[in-house]
Protein backbone atom coordinates (compact mmCIF):
# COMPACT_ATOMS: atom_id res chain seq x y z
CA UNK A 1 0.00 0.00 0.00
CA UNK A 2 2.83 2.35 0.91
CA UNK A 3 4.59 1.78 -2.40
CA UNK A 4 1.33 2.12 -4.28
CA UNK A 5 0.58 5.48 -2.66
CA UNK A 6 4.08 6.76 -3.31
CA UNK A 7 3.90 5.50 -6.91
CA UNK A 8 0.83 7.62 -7.41
CA UNK A 9 2.73 10.66 -6.11
CA UNK A 10 5.80 9.95 -8.24
CA UNK A 11 3.75 9.68 -11.40
CA UNK A 12 2.26 13.12 -11.12
CA UNK A 13 4.70 15.48 -9.44
CA UNK A 14 6.84 15.98 -12.51
CA UNK A 15 5.38 16.87 -15.88
CA UNK A 16 7.09 13.97 -17.55
CA UNK A 17 6.38 11.69 -14.61
CA UNK A 18 2.76 12.58 -15.08
CA UNK A 19 3.21 11.20 -18.55
CA UNK A 20 4.28 7.88 -17.13
CA UNK A 21 0.80 7.24 -15.74
CA UNK A 22 -0.38 7.11 -19.32
CA UNK A 23 2.19 4.42 -20.01
CA UNK A 24 1.20 1.93 -17.36
CA UNK A 25 -1.60 -0.53 -17.71
CA UNK A 26 -3.75 -1.14 -20.75
CA UNK A 27 -4.04 1.56 -23.40
CA UNK A 28 -7.59 1.98 -24.64
CA UNK A 29 -7.27 2.89 -28.29
CA UNK A 30 -9.57 5.69 -29.39
CA UNK A 31 -11.41 5.79 -32.73
CA UNK A 32 -9.70 7.70 -35.55
CA UNK A 33 -10.39 11.42 -35.10
CA UNK A 34 -10.49 13.15 -38.51
CA UNK A 35 -10.51 16.70 -37.07
CA UNK A 36 -7.44 15.85 -34.98
CA UNK A 37 -5.62 14.42 -38.01
CA UNK A 38 -6.42 17.52 -40.14
CA UNK A 39 -5.26 19.94 -37.41
CA UNK A 40 -2.17 17.87 -36.77
CA UNK A 41 -1.30 17.95 -40.50
CA UNK A 42 -1.81 21.73 -40.54
CA UNK A 43 0.56 22.06 -37.56
CA UNK A 44 3.19 19.80 -39.13
CA UNK A 45 2.91 21.62 -42.47
CA UNK A 46 3.29 24.99 -40.75
CA UNK A 47 6.26 23.93 -38.65
CA UNK A 48 8.01 22.28 -41.61
CA UNK A 49 7.65 25.58 -43.49
CA UNK A 50 9.19 27.35 -40.46
CA UNK A 51 12.04 24.80 -40.57
CA UNK A 52 12.60 25.62 -44.26
CA UNK A 53 12.55 29.36 -43.43
CA UNK A 54 14.93 28.83 -40.50
CA UNK A 55 17.33 26.74 -42.60
CA UNK A 56 17.85 29.74 -44.91
CA UNK A 57 18.88 31.83 -41.89
CA UNK A 58 21.05 29.20 -40.19
CA UNK A 59 24.50 29.68 -41.68
CA UNK A 60 26.95 29.63 -38.78
CA UNK A 61 27.62 27.65 -35.62
CA UNK A 62 26.13 30.48 -33.55
CA UNK A 63 22.96 30.43 -35.68
CA UNK A 64 22.63 26.66 -35.29
CA UNK A 65 23.19 26.45 -31.51
CA UNK A 66 21.67 29.75 -30.33
CA UNK A 67 19.63 31.21 -33.24
CA UNK A 68 22.34 33.87 -33.47
CA UNK A 69 21.38 35.21 -30.01
CA UNK A 70 18.57 37.17 -31.68
CA UNK A 71 15.59 35.81 -29.73
CA UNK A 72 13.93 38.40 -27.46
CA UNK A 73 13.30 37.80 -23.76
CA UNK A 74 9.54 37.47 -24.32
CA UNK A 75 9.95 35.03 -27.23
CA UNK A 76 12.47 32.99 -25.26
CA UNK A 77 10.17 32.93 -22.23
CA UNK A 78 7.41 31.46 -24.39
CA UNK A 79 9.86 28.98 -25.94
CA UNK A 80 11.13 27.87 -22.49
CA UNK A 81 7.51 27.37 -21.41
CA UNK A 82 6.96 25.39 -24.60
CA UNK A 83 10.05 23.31 -23.88
CA UNK A 84 8.98 22.63 -20.29
CA UNK A 85 5.19 22.15 -20.37
CA UNK A 86 4.51 18.59 -21.45
CA UNK A 87 1.30 17.36 -23.05
CA UNK A 88 1.17 14.62 -20.49
CA UNK A 89 1.47 17.05 -17.61
CA UNK A 90 -1.62 18.68 -19.09
CA UNK A 91 -3.32 15.27 -19.20
CA UNK A 92 -1.63 13.88 -16.07
CA UNK A 93 -2.10 16.75 -13.62
CA UNK A 94 -5.70 17.30 -14.71
CA UNK A 95 -6.22 13.53 -14.32
CA UNK A 96 -4.80 13.70 -10.79
CA UNK A 97 -7.16 16.56 -9.92
CA UNK A 98 -10.02 14.59 -11.50
CA UNK A 99 -9.17 11.55 -9.33
CA UNK A 100 -7.89 13.16 -6.11
CA UNK A 101 -8.86 16.84 -6.12
CA UNK A 102 -6.74 19.29 -4.14
CA UNK A 103 -3.55 17.19 -4.21
CA UNK A 104 -3.22 18.01 -7.89
CA UNK A 105 -2.79 21.72 -7.11
CA UNK A 106 -0.02 21.01 -4.59
CA UNK A 107 1.98 19.00 -7.10
CA UNK A 108 1.41 21.25 -10.09
CA UNK A 109 2.53 24.34 -8.17
CA UNK A 110 5.31 22.39 -6.45
CA UNK A 111 6.71 21.75 -9.90
CA UNK A 112 7.30 25.51 -10.28
CA UNK A 113 9.69 25.91 -7.37
CA UNK A 114 12.83 25.33 -9.41
CA UNK A 115 12.27 28.47 -11.46
CA UNK A 116 13.08 31.14 -8.83
CA UNK A 117 16.45 29.38 -8.38
CA UNK A 118 17.12 29.78 -12.10
CA UNK A 119 15.90 33.39 -12.06
CA UNK A 120 17.88 34.65 -9.06
CA UNK A 121 20.95 32.42 -9.02
CA UNK A 122 21.67 31.12 -12.51
CA UNK A 123 20.20 32.92 -15.55
CA UNK A 124 22.30 36.10 -15.54
CA UNK A 125 25.65 34.49 -14.72
CA UNK A 126 25.01 31.62 -17.13
CA UNK A 127 24.44 34.04 -20.02
CA UNK A 128 27.48 36.18 -19.16
CA UNK A 129 29.89 33.26 -18.78
CA UNK A 130 28.68 30.79 -21.42
CA UNK A 131 28.30 30.66 -25.17
CA UNK A 132 26.56 27.48 -26.35
CA UNK A 133 26.28 24.94 -23.50
CA UNK A 134 26.42 25.01 -19.69
CA UNK A 135 29.82 23.24 -19.90
CA UNK A 136 31.22 26.60 -21.13
CA UNK A 137 30.36 27.97 -17.68
CA UNK A 138 31.52 24.97 -15.65
CA UNK A 139 34.90 24.89 -17.42
CA UNK A 140 35.44 28.68 -17.51
CA UNK A 141 38.39 28.66 -15.06
CA UNK A 142 38.88 24.90 -14.69
CA UNK A 143 40.60 22.39 -16.97
CA UNK A 144 38.56 22.21 -20.17
CA UNK A 145 38.82 18.57 -21.21
CA UNK A 146 37.89 16.69 -17.98
CA UNK A 147 35.13 19.16 -17.01
CA UNK A 148 33.58 19.18 -20.49
CA UNK A 149 33.71 15.37 -20.59
CA UNK A 150 31.86 15.18 -17.26
CA UNK A 151 29.32 17.86 -18.29
CA UNK A 152 28.69 16.20 -21.66
CA UNK A 153 28.20 12.78 -20.03
CA UNK A 154 25.78 14.26 -17.49
CA UNK A 155 23.90 16.02 -20.30
CA UNK A 156 23.72 12.95 -22.53
CA UNK A 157 22.45 10.68 -19.76
CA UNK A 158 19.72 13.20 -18.85
CA UNK A 159 18.80 13.73 -22.52
CA UNK A 160 18.72 9.99 -23.27
CA UNK A 161 16.49 9.11 -20.32
CA UNK A 162 14.17 12.07 -20.91
CA UNK A 163 14.04 11.25 -24.64
CA UNK A 164 13.01 7.65 -23.95
CA UNK A 165 10.23 8.91 -21.68
CA UNK A 166 9.02 11.37 -24.30
CA UNK A 167 9.14 8.82 -27.16
CA UNK A 168 7.29 6.11 -25.25
CA UNK A 169 4.85 8.74 -24.00
CA UNK A 170 4.41 10.03 -27.55
CA UNK A 171 3.55 6.57 -28.85
CA UNK A 172 1.06 5.84 -26.09
CA UNK A 173 -0.60 9.26 -26.11
CA UNK A 174 -0.98 9.32 -29.89
CA UNK A 175 -2.43 5.83 -29.68
CA UNK A 176 -4.89 7.19 -27.11
CA UNK A 177 -5.75 10.42 -28.92
CA UNK A 178 -5.55 9.55 -32.61
CA UNK A 179 -6.04 5.80 -32.79
CA UNK A 180 -2.70 5.44 -34.63
CA UNK A 181 -0.44 2.38 -34.24
CA UNK A 182 2.21 2.80 -31.50
CA UNK A 183 5.21 2.04 -33.75
CA UNK A 184 3.94 4.39 -36.48
CA UNK A 185 3.55 7.16 -33.88
CA UNK A 186 7.10 6.70 -32.51
CA UNK A 187 8.67 6.66 -35.99
CA UNK A 188 6.65 9.74 -37.01
CA UNK A 189 7.77 11.72 -33.95
CA UNK A 190 11.38 10.62 -34.51
CA UNK A 191 11.41 11.70 -38.16
CA UNK A 192 9.82 15.10 -37.49
CA UNK A 193 12.15 15.74 -34.55
CA UNK A 194 15.21 15.06 -36.75
CA UNK A 195 13.88 17.29 -39.56
CA UNK A 196 13.28 20.26 -37.24
CA UNK A 197 16.70 20.12 -35.60
CA UNK A 198 18.79 18.96 -38.58
CA UNK A 199 17.72 21.72 -40.95
CA UNK A 200 16.38 24.49 -38.73
CA UNK A 201 18.63 24.25 -35.66
CA UNK A 202 17.76 26.41 -32.67
CA UNK A 203 15.73 28.92 -34.72
CA UNK A 204 13.26 26.28 -35.95
CA UNK A 205 13.19 24.57 -32.54
CA UNK A 206 12.44 27.91 -30.84
CA UNK A 207 9.50 28.71 -33.12
CA UNK A 208 8.07 25.19 -32.85
CA UNK A 209 8.18 25.63 -29.05
CA UNK A 210 6.61 29.11 -29.21
CA UNK A 211 3.75 27.94 -31.45
CA UNK A 212 3.16 24.92 -29.24
CA UNK A 213 3.11 27.09 -26.09
CA UNK A 214 0.59 29.49 -27.63
CA UNK A 215 -1.63 26.58 -28.79
CA UNK A 216 -1.48 24.83 -25.42
CA UNK A 217 -2.12 27.99 -23.38
CA UNK A 218 -4.96 29.05 -25.72
CA UNK A 219 -6.63 25.65 -25.61
CA UNK A 220 -6.30 25.34 -21.83
CA UNK A 221 -7.58 28.92 -21.34
CA UNK A 222 -10.66 28.23 -23.48
CA UNK A 223 -11.40 25.05 -21.52
CA UNK A 224 -11.01 26.83 -18.18
CA UNK A 225 -13.27 29.71 -19.31
CA UNK A 226 -15.97 27.27 -20.49
CA UNK A 227 -15.77 25.39 -17.19
CA UNK A 228 -16.13 28.63 -15.21
CA UNK A 229 -18.97 29.75 -17.49
CA UNK A 230 -20.88 26.58 -16.59
CA UNK A 231 -20.78 27.65 -12.90
CA UNK A 232 -21.38 31.38 -13.57
CA UNK A 233 -17.68 32.13 -12.88
CA UNK A 234 -18.15 31.22 -9.22
CA UNK A 235 -15.40 29.09 -7.63
CA UNK A 236 -17.61 28.24 -4.64
CA UNK A 237 -20.16 26.71 -7.00
CA UNK A 238 -17.43 24.82 -8.90
CA UNK A 239 -16.01 23.24 -5.74
CA UNK A 240 -19.32 22.55 -3.98
CA UNK A 241 -20.82 20.91 -7.10
CA UNK A 242 -17.64 18.87 -7.62
CA UNK A 243 -17.81 17.62 -4.01
CA UNK A 244 -21.44 16.53 -4.59
CA UNK A 245 -20.69 14.42 -7.68
CA UNK A 246 -17.23 13.02 -6.80
CA UNK A 247 -17.15 9.52 -5.22
CA UNK A 248 -14.68 10.72 -2.54
CA UNK A 249 -16.91 13.62 -1.56
CA UNK A 250 -15.41 16.29 0.69
CA UNK A 251 -12.02 14.55 0.91
CA UNK A 252 -11.11 15.91 -2.56
CA UNK A 253 -10.74 19.32 -0.89
CA UNK A 254 -8.09 18.02 1.56
CA UNK A 255 -4.34 17.64 0.90
CA UNK A 256 -1.96 14.79 1.67
CA UNK A 257 -3.85 11.83 0.25
CA UNK A 258 -0.90 10.62 -1.80
CA UNK A 259 2.07 11.19 0.52
CA UNK A 260 3.07 8.34 2.82
CA UNK A 261 6.89 8.30 2.70
CA UNK A 262 8.53 11.60 3.71
CA UNK A 263 12.08 10.58 2.65
CA UNK A 264 10.95 9.70 -0.88
CA UNK A 265 8.83 12.85 -1.01
CA UNK A 266 11.82 14.97 0.04
CA UNK A 267 14.13 13.17 -2.39
CA UNK A 268 11.77 13.66 -5.32
CA UNK A 269 11.15 17.26 -4.26
CA UNK A 270 14.90 17.97 -4.33
CA UNK A 271 15.24 16.30 -7.75
CA UNK A 272 12.35 18.38 -9.05
CA UNK A 273 13.53 21.65 -7.53
CA UNK A 274 17.22 21.47 -8.42
CA UNK A 275 16.96 19.13 -11.41
CA UNK A 276 15.10 21.83 -13.31
CA UNK A 277 18.20 24.04 -12.95
CA UNK A 278 20.36 21.24 -14.39
CA UNK A 279 18.34 20.26 -17.47
CA UNK A 280 20.63 20.86 -20.47
CA UNK A 281 17.83 21.66 -22.94
CA UNK A 282 16.46 24.34 -20.58
CA UNK A 283 19.88 25.87 -19.78
CA UNK A 284 20.76 25.99 -23.48
CA UNK A 285 17.88 28.36 -24.12
CA UNK A 286 19.57 31.18 -22.16
CA UNK A 287 22.23 31.52 -24.86
CA UNK A 288 19.61 32.37 -27.51
CA UNK A 289 19.12 35.91 -26.14
CA UNK A 290 21.43 38.90 -26.61
CA UNK A 291 22.49 39.54 -23.00
CA UNK A 292 21.94 38.81 -19.30
CA UNK A 293 19.04 41.28 -19.04
CA UNK A 294 17.10 39.38 -21.72
CA UNK A 295 18.01 36.08 -19.99
CA UNK A 296 16.40 37.34 -16.75
CA UNK A 297 13.33 38.47 -18.70
CA UNK A 298 13.14 35.00 -20.27
CA UNK A 299 12.85 33.30 -16.88
CA UNK A 300 10.39 35.90 -15.63
CA UNK A 301 8.04 35.33 -18.59
CA UNK A 302 8.53 31.55 -18.59
CA UNK A 303 7.67 31.32 -14.88
CA UNK A 304 4.52 33.36 -15.48
CA UNK A 305 3.37 31.22 -18.42
CA UNK A 306 4.14 27.93 -16.66
CA UNK A 307 2.45 29.04 -13.42
CA UNK A 308 -0.62 30.21 -15.34
CA UNK A 309 -0.77 26.89 -17.19
CA UNK A 310 -0.76 24.87 -13.98
CA UNK A 311 -3.50 26.99 -12.44
CA UNK A 312 -5.55 26.23 -15.57
CA UNK A 313 -4.98 22.47 -15.19
CA UNK A 314 -6.47 22.69 -11.70
CA UNK A 315 -9.63 24.34 -13.03
CA UNK A 316 -9.74 21.84 -15.90
CA UNK A 317 -9.44 18.92 -13.45
CA UNK A 318 -12.36 20.17 -11.33
CA UNK A 319 -14.27 20.92 -14.54
CA UNK A 320 -13.80 17.30 -15.55
CA UNK A 321 -15.19 16.15 -12.17
CA UNK A 322 -18.27 18.29 -12.80
CA UNK A 323 -18.87 17.90 -16.56
CA UNK A 324 -17.25 14.56 -17.45
CA UNK A 325 -17.65 12.47 -14.28
CA UNK A 326 -21.47 12.28 -14.22
CA UNK A 327 -21.79 12.00 -18.05
CA UNK A 328 -22.23 8.37 -19.12
CA UNK A 329 -21.23 9.26 -22.71
CA UNK A 330 -17.60 9.29 -21.56
CA UNK A 331 -17.82 6.02 -19.57
CA UNK A 332 -17.42 2.37 -20.55
CA UNK A 333 -19.77 -0.46 -19.59
CA UNK A 334 -18.04 -0.85 -16.21
CA UNK A 335 -18.50 2.86 -15.44
CA UNK A 336 -14.80 3.75 -15.81
CA UNK A 337 -13.64 6.71 -17.90
CA UNK A 338 -13.00 5.76 -21.54
CA UNK A 339 -9.24 5.58 -22.05
CA UNK A 340 -8.58 5.89 -18.32
CA UNK A 341 -8.27 8.98 -16.11
CA UNK A 342 -5.61 10.47 -18.40
CA UNK A 343 -8.36 11.16 -20.92
CA UNK A 344 -10.27 13.43 -18.48
CA UNK A 345 -9.00 16.66 -20.09
CA UNK A 346 -9.61 15.30 -23.61
CA UNK A 347 -13.19 14.30 -22.74
CA UNK A 348 -13.69 17.73 -21.17
CA UNK A 349 -12.54 19.31 -24.46
CA UNK A 350 -15.29 17.33 -26.18
CA UNK A 351 -17.83 18.31 -23.51
CA UNK A 352 -17.16 22.07 -23.73
CA UNK A 353 -16.18 22.48 -27.41
CA UNK A 354 -17.48 19.51 -29.37
CA UNK A 355 -15.55 17.36 -31.84
CA UNK A 356 -13.78 20.34 -33.45
CA UNK A 357 -12.21 21.44 -30.17
CA UNK A 358 -11.48 17.82 -29.27
CA UNK A 359 -9.48 17.63 -32.51
CA UNK A 360 -7.64 20.83 -31.61
CA UNK A 361 -6.65 19.56 -28.14
CA UNK A 362 -5.50 16.22 -29.60
CA UNK A 363 -3.31 18.07 -32.13
CA UNK A 364 -1.93 20.27 -29.33
CA UNK A 365 -0.88 17.14 -27.42
CA UNK A 366 1.11 15.96 -30.45
CA UNK A 367 2.61 19.44 -31.00
CA UNK A 368 3.75 19.49 -27.39
CA UNK A 369 5.64 16.22 -27.70
CA UNK A 370 7.39 17.41 -30.87
CA UNK A 371 8.47 20.66 -29.21
CA UNK A 372 9.99 18.87 -26.21
CA UNK A 373 11.88 16.19 -28.17
CA UNK A 374 13.29 18.81 -30.57
CA UNK A 375 14.79 20.74 -27.64
CA UNK A 376 16.23 17.56 -26.11
CA UNK A 377 17.79 16.48 -29.41
CA UNK A 378 19.50 19.82 -29.96
CA UNK A 379 20.89 19.78 -26.39
CA UNK A 380 22.26 16.26 -26.89
CA UNK A 381 23.79 17.12 -30.27
CA UNK A 382 25.49 20.26 -28.91
CA UNK A 383 26.97 18.28 -25.98
CA UNK A 384 28.59 15.87 -28.46
CA UNK A 385 29.71 18.36 -31.12
CA UNK A 386 30.68 21.40 -29.01
CA UNK A 387 31.83 19.82 -25.75
CA UNK A 388 33.19 16.41 -26.76
CA UNK A 389 34.27 16.83 -30.40
CA UNK A 390 35.42 20.47 -30.59
CA UNK A 391 36.76 20.93 -27.04
CA UNK A 392 37.89 17.46 -25.92
CA UNK A 393 38.84 15.51 -29.07
CA UNK A 394 40.06 18.47 -31.16
CA UNK A 395 41.31 20.41 -28.10
CA UNK A 396 39.53 23.60 -29.19
CA UNK A 397 41.01 23.57 -32.70
CA UNK A 398 38.00 22.25 -34.65
CA UNK A 399 36.75 24.44 -37.47
CA UNK A 400 33.13 25.59 -37.51
CA UNK A 401 32.16 23.50 -40.53
CA UNK A 402 33.39 20.23 -39.01
CA UNK A 403 31.70 20.97 -35.69
CA UNK A 404 28.36 21.59 -37.41
CA UNK A 405 28.74 18.40 -39.43
CA UNK A 406 29.35 16.38 -36.25
CA UNK A 407 26.30 18.03 -34.65
CA UNK A 408 24.05 17.10 -37.57
CA UNK A 409 25.35 13.52 -37.68
CA UNK A 410 24.62 13.30 -33.93
CA UNK A 411 21.05 14.55 -34.52
CA UNK A 412 20.44 11.71 -37.00
CA UNK A 413 21.99 9.13 -34.64
CA UNK A 414 19.93 10.47 -31.70
CA UNK A 415 16.78 10.24 -33.84
CA UNK A 416 17.47 6.60 -34.75
CA UNK A 417 18.38 5.72 -31.15
CA UNK A 418 15.27 7.51 -29.82
CA UNK A 419 13.00 5.57 -32.22
CA UNK A 420 14.72 2.28 -31.34
CA UNK A 421 14.51 2.85 -27.59
CA UNK A 422 10.93 4.08 -27.88
CA UNK A 423 9.96 0.78 -29.53
CA UNK A 424 12.16 -1.30 -27.18
CA UNK A 425 10.67 0.24 -24.01
CA UNK A 426 7.06 0.14 -25.23
CA UNK A 427 5.93 -2.26 -22.48
CA UNK A 428 7.98 -0.70 -19.67
CA UNK A 429 6.82 1.69 -16.98
CA UNK A 430 9.33 4.45 -17.65
CA UNK A 431 8.46 6.73 -14.73
CA UNK A 432 11.72 5.77 -13.01
CA UNK A 433 13.71 6.93 -16.07
CA UNK A 434 12.37 10.45 -15.78
CA UNK A 435 12.92 10.43 -12.04
CA UNK A 436 16.49 9.32 -12.70
CA UNK A 437 16.92 12.03 -15.37
CA UNK A 438 15.89 14.74 -12.91
CA UNK A 439 17.94 13.14 -10.13
CA UNK A 440 21.06 13.08 -12.33
CA UNK A 441 20.47 16.68 -13.41
CA UNK A 442 20.22 17.62 -9.72
CA UNK A 443 23.17 15.45 -8.63
CA UNK A 444 25.68 16.11 -11.41
CA UNK A 445 24.82 19.11 -13.60
CA UNK A 446 23.36 21.45 -10.96
CA UNK A 447 26.20 21.14 -8.38
CA UNK A 448 28.85 21.76 -11.06
CA UNK A 449 27.06 24.86 -12.38
CA UNK A 450 26.18 26.45 -9.05
CA UNK A 451 29.53 25.77 -7.31
CA UNK A 452 31.61 26.90 -10.30
CA UNK A 453 29.66 30.19 -10.36
CA UNK A 454 29.70 30.98 -6.64
CA UNK A 455 32.60 29.24 -4.82
CA UNK A 456 36.10 30.62 -5.26
CA UNK A 457 37.87 27.57 -3.79
CA UNK A 458 36.56 25.09 -6.39
CA UNK A 459 39.24 23.16 -8.30
CA UNK A 460 39.11 20.73 -11.21
CA UNK A 461 39.88 17.82 -8.87
CA UNK A 462 36.95 18.67 -6.58
CA UNK A 463 34.53 19.24 -9.47
CA UNK A 464 35.50 15.97 -11.18
CA UNK A 465 35.32 13.75 -8.09
CA UNK A 466 32.14 15.44 -6.79
CA UNK A 467 30.43 15.37 -10.20
CA UNK A 468 31.21 11.71 -10.93
CA UNK A 469 30.28 10.82 -7.34
CA UNK A 470 26.86 12.47 -7.73
CA UNK A 471 26.27 10.86 -11.13
CA UNK A 472 27.29 7.34 -10.07
CA UNK A 473 25.49 7.52 -6.70
CA UNK A 474 22.24 8.55 -8.42
CA UNK A 475 22.47 5.67 -10.93
CA UNK A 476 23.51 3.02 -8.35
CA UNK A 477 20.81 3.96 -5.80
CA UNK A 478 18.18 4.01 -8.55
CA UNK A 479 19.19 0.47 -9.61
CA UNK A 480 19.12 -0.73 -5.97
CA UNK A 481 15.74 0.96 -5.33
CA UNK A 482 12.27 -0.64 -5.46
CA UNK A 483 11.47 0.27 -9.08
CA UNK A 484 14.39 -1.54 -10.73
CA UNK A 485 15.64 -3.98 -8.06
CA UNK A 486 12.19 -5.37 -7.19
CA UNK A 487 9.75 -4.58 -10.01
CA UNK A 488 12.09 -5.11 -12.98
CA UNK A 489 14.82 -7.46 -11.68
CA UNK A 490 12.42 -9.48 -9.54
CA UNK A 491 14.20 -9.45 -6.16
CA UNK A 492 12.10 -9.72 -3.01
CA UNK A 493 13.27 -6.53 -1.24
CA UNK A 494 15.08 -3.40 -2.44
CA UNK A 495 18.57 -2.70 -1.04
CA UNK A 496 17.85 1.05 -1.17
CA UNK A 497 14.28 1.46 0.17
CA UNK A 498 13.31 4.78 -1.48
CA UNK A 499 12.09 5.55 -4.99
CA UNK A 500 14.44 8.43 -5.80
CA UNK A 501 18.12 8.98 -4.91
CA UNK A 502 18.51 12.79 -5.11
CA UNK A 503 18.55 13.39 -1.33
CA UNK A 504 21.66 11.22 -0.95
CA UNK A 505 23.32 11.67 -4.36
CA UNK A 506 23.16 15.47 -4.11
CA UNK A 507 24.79 15.35 -0.67
CA UNK A 508 27.50 13.07 -2.10
CA UNK A 509 28.11 15.49 -4.99
CA UNK A 510 28.32 18.64 -2.85
CA UNK A 511 30.37 17.07 -0.03
CA UNK A 512 32.72 15.37 -2.52
CA UNK A 513 33.23 18.61 -4.45
CA UNK A 514 33.86 20.59 -1.25
CA UNK A 515 36.23 18.10 0.40
CA UNK A 516 38.39 17.32 -2.64
CA UNK A 517 38.63 21.02 -3.52
CA UNK A 518 39.76 22.26 -0.10
CA UNK A 519 42.33 19.44 0.15
CA UNK A 520 43.72 20.20 -3.33
CA UNK A 521 47.06 21.95 -2.73
CA UNK A 522 48.42 21.50 -6.26
CA UNK A 523 49.78 24.43 -8.28
CA UNK A 524 46.95 23.96 -10.79
CA UNK A 525 44.39 24.21 -8.00
CA UNK A 526 45.97 27.42 -6.70
CA UNK A 527 45.88 28.97 -10.18
CA UNK A 528 42.22 28.00 -10.62
CA UNK A 529 41.30 29.71 -7.35
CA UNK A 530 43.08 32.90 -8.45
CA UNK A 531 41.05 32.96 -11.70
CA UNK A 532 37.77 33.25 -9.77
CA UNK A 533 38.03 37.06 -9.47
CA UNK A 534 38.10 37.62 -13.23
CA UNK A 535 35.24 35.12 -13.63
CA UNK A 536 33.23 36.95 -10.96
CA UNK A 537 33.71 40.32 -12.71
CA UNK A 538 32.54 38.91 -16.04
CA UNK A 539 29.60 37.07 -14.47
CA UNK A 540 28.39 40.30 -12.84
CA UNK A 541 29.12 42.81 -15.60
CA UNK A 542 29.00 40.81 -18.82
CA UNK A 543 32.34 42.33 -19.91
CA UNK A 544 33.76 39.99 -22.54
CA UNK A 545 30.56 37.93 -22.80
CA UNK A 546 29.51 36.59 -26.20
CA UNK A 547 27.02 38.95 -27.82
CA UNK A 548 23.87 38.00 -29.68
CA UNK A 549 22.66 39.75 -32.80
CA UNK A 550 20.38 42.76 -32.81
CA UNK A 551 16.70 42.01 -32.50
Curated annotation (Swiss-Prot):
Origin: domain of life: Bacteria
Transmembrane segments: 5-25, 34-54, 77-97, 104-124, 150-170, 184-204, 207-227, 263-283, 304-324, 356-376, 406-426, 430-450, 469-489, 498-518
Chief location: membrane
Keywords, ordered alphabetically: Cell inner membrane, Cell membrane, Ion transport, Membrane, Sodium, Sodium transport, Symport, Transmembrane, Transmembrane helix, Transport
Subcellular location: Cell inner membrane
Keyword Lipid biosynthesis on entry: no
Membrane topology, as annotated: Multi-pass membrane protein
Keyword presence, Transport: yes
Single GO BP term: plasma membrane acetate transport
Gene Ontology MF terms in the entry: acetate transmembrane transporter activity; glycolate transmembrane transporter activity; symporter activity
GO cellular component terms, A-Z: plasma membrane
Family of the protein in this entry: Belongs to the sodium:solute symporter (SSF) (TC 2.A.21) family.
Role according to the record: Transports acetate.
NCBIfam families for this protein: PRK09395.1, PRK12488.1, sss, symport_actP
Name of the molecule in the record: Cation/acetate symporter ActP
Species this chain originates from: Yersinia pseudotuberculosis serotype O:3 (strain YPIII)
Amino acid sequence: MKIRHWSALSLFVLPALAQAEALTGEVHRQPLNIQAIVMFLLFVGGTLYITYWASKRTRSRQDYYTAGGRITGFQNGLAIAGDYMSAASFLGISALVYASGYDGLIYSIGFLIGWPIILFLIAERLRNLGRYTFADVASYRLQQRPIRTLSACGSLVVVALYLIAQMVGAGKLIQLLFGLNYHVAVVLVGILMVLYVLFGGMLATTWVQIIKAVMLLSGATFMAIMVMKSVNFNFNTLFSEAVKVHPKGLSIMSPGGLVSDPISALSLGLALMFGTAGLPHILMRFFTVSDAKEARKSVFYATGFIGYFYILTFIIGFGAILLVGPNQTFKDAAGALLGGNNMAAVHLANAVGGSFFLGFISAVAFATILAVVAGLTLAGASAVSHDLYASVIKKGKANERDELRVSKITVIILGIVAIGLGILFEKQNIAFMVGLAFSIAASCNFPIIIISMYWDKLTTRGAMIGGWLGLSTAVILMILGPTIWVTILGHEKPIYPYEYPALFSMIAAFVGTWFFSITDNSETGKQERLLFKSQFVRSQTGLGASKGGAH
